[in-house]
Amino acid sequence: HQLIRAFAALKQQNYKLVLAGDTDFEDDYSKKLKSLAKENGVILTGFIKGTKLHELLTHARCFVLPSSHEGLPIALLEAMSYDLPVIVSNIPANLEVGLAFDCYFQTGNEKQLQEKLQKNLVQDFCSVHYFMDEYNWDRIAEQVVSVYRNMF
């Protein structure tokens, strides 16, 4: 809820907030969260993986993990593997990752989260590009043949 409110306070017309994932069971909090998201034009994807998750992460402006409780933050590590800028709460599990100080915000501090979001949105955007030419099968086969030729 803090992320939705912080993003909504920015009144950014050119950006969308996308929340990926869902809860295992529907409770009052998750119902309120979904209602708040709908009121503020937030996109809720539900659980996603594979190609859809890859598309989301390659087109993301940044990754935010505002958790107040978290084990090993796999989603954070995954976002970092895409070289995304990250904004995370300063809970112990996130601190263990060892990010730069300015990636963290005080857990529960919506104003600080809002400031971090604003700072991210004014920076130049560099989309993530993967140079897949190096990984096509023809090129790999040529490299393998080259290795064998050099052996003899």
Regions found by a protein language model. Name each.
Residues 102-110, 118-122:
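Conserved acidic donor-binding segment of nucleotide-sugar-dependent glycosyltransferases
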